């Protein structure tokens, strides 16, 4: 009976001592990233004709030191006010970049990374329609865009397979006719794979 009580005591100590963390950010580990964010300002009901949003999906592959290569695609939609209406500008981009681990805690739960990416894609203004409902003509052209982005991202592990992302990003794209720079910020989830 004493052996059983001692065994249960040791097991309970092991269970309530704390959670054991799996090894994280090892070279070759991969994760699927899903992100959503805002661009070029904050949303408010008074500025709904000028807001923009983005969605993205990418694959992150870790290298030594918690650094990572990220390759993926992103959709960004920005509205430009026009009288009582708004004109949508959409960018479909693909890109790849390298993120360098800047800061992490000892338990490998929190990471701060800085990254540089190359981007290329297509920009369309008002869905390719040149004529507006009031008879005006849009002069901006649809076309291919190219450029890059710098990113600052924070990651925190919610579990061994689920990571919460917070990011800020500055995109600079040439080739489009609606502006070069777009500031983005948002949240995302990374699902770690074996």
Segments and roles (model prediction):
Residues 1-28:
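Bacterial Sec-dependent N-terminal signal peptides
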Residues 20-71, 190-194:
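Short glycine/proline- and aromatic-enriched beta-strand/turn motifs that initiate or cap beta-hairpins
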Residues 28-32, 49-55, 88-94, 110, ...:
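Residues that define the transmembrane beta-barrel architecture of outer-membrane proteins
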Residues 35, 52-54, 70-74, 95-98, ...:
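Residue-level detection of beta-strand scaffold positions
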Residues 42-45, 80-87, 134-140, 172-176:
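Extracellular loop and loop/strand-boundary signature of outer-membrane beta-barrel proteins
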Residues 58-133, 162, 191-194:
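Gram-negative (and chloroplast) outer-membrane scaffold detector with strong preference
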Residues 78, 153-194:
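Predominantly the C-terminal beta-signal and adjacent terminal strand-loop region
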């Amino acid at each position: 009976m004493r052996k059983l009580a001692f065994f249960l005591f040791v097991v309970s100590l092991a269970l309530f001592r704390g959670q054991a963390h799996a090894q994280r950010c090892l070279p070759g580990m991969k994760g699927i990233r899903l992100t959503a964010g805002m661009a070029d300002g904050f949303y408010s009901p008074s500025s709904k004709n000028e807001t923009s949003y983005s969605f993205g999906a990418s694959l992150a592959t870790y290298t030594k030191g918690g650094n990572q290569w990220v390759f993926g695609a992103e959709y960004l939609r920005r509205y430009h006010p026009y009288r009582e209406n708004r004109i949508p500008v959409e960018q479909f981009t693909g890109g790849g970049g390298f993120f360098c681990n800047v800061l992490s805690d000892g338990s490998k739960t929190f990471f701060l990374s800085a990254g540089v990416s190359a981007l290329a894609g297509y920009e369309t203004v008002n869905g390719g329609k040149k004529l507006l409902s009031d008879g005006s003509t849009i002069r901006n052209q649809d076309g291919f865009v190219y450029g890059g982005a710098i990113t600052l991202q924070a990651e925190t592990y919610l579990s061994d397979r689920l990571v919460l992302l917070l990011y800020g990003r500055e995109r600079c794209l040439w080739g489009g006719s609606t502006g070069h720079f777009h500031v983005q910020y948002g949240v995302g989830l990374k699902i770690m794979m074996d």
